[in-house]
Amino acid sequence: MLSFPIETGSISKNKFTAKLSTSMACVLLLLTTGCSQGETKSAQSVEAINTKSASTVAASNSVSTLRIGYVGNSEPTGPLGWAKKKGILDRELQQAGFKNITFARFPNGPDLNEALVAGQLDVGSLGDTPAIVLRARGQETRLLRITQFNTTAWLVAKKNGPRSLAELKGQKIATQKGSYMHRYLLGLLAEAKIAKDVKVVHLMTTEAKAALERGDVAAYATSSDLGPFLKSQGFPVIDSSANHKGLSGTSLVVATESFLAKQPDFPQKFNAILTEAAKDLKANSEEYYQYHAQITKYPIDIIKVSLPLKQISEEPLPAEGVKLLEGTKKFLVSQGLAKSDFKLTDWAAKE
């Protein structure tokens, strides 16, 4: 397990118990550990969804079984989720020799990382920050694809609270640790030169609205979907990553090297599936938006704002996405948040 004896903090119904600063040493631990709010901490307690039969989970060590982990809701979204929903994934992978496909849902990237390290997953769909941090620790993963890039993060304030970054001095700001929103917040605070003047605490996105309503936090750095939704509910937006070069996120698909050693042609086959799914969801955008809204429980007009389909990549490594990913990696390394540097070209799987 990737865990350290550190107080990461959590939020009770009435107040924060966390006393975490934004010092780089603490943030490094935040980025490499899982959450501690009674959420899922390892693959042993994640929700496994088998496209064939629950009994096949026991056969997860078989080469004929593909174990996919993802961060998010009851079902994956984006090209992976669409490929699953439309039957593209099942059809093509069965032809490739996979008899069983299992899906495990995780609340955040660090928890998914733990499952990859433990050998409980073959493939992971997650954000750039946890994926980079894991690779920088020397874990043997390979980058298969950038599925989405320029994903916006938002900094939303409580009502009747601060309206500018300067007004956040001396305040508590929350975000979901180890996420692309976390990296955005760290970069934003560094740009504004107020990193030492605020307290950053961990809070899952599912608890953000209630915490803002109670006034437990002055602001919350949140995801592309939740940001516009909170704005529609009257919460002021202080900032978004769209206002800053290099602070938006990318979504990645990685695989373990041990799995790829057994399935060397998997990157090409899997990327072909996701490319087909990406093109199909764009060609059927209204149907996809309805699916995405159903899964995330946000109104469809919010989804259309939060997810311009131009962010969905039709190729494995789009140039714009690679540039953004390189910038994120450099930031994490320069701040000591990623343990070591590496070349993206070395990380990328060869097709």
Regions found by a protein language model. Name each.
Residues 31-34:
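C-terminal motif of bacterial Sec signal peptides marking the signal peptidase cleavage site
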Residues 36-39:
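Bacterial signal peptide processing site
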Residues 53, 57-85:
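Extracytoplasmic "Venus flytrap"
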Residues 63-66, 92-105, 120-122, 190-202, ...:
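A local structural motif
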Residues 74, 261-337:
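Secondary-structure end/capping motifs
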Residues 109-121, 136-139, 167-169, 188-191, ...:
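Short helices/loops that flank or line small-molecule/ion binding pockets
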Residues 129-130, 197-201, 205-293:
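Pocket-lining segment of extracytoplasmic ligand-binding domains
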Residues 157-173, 259-268:
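Flexible hinge/capping segments at coil-to-helix
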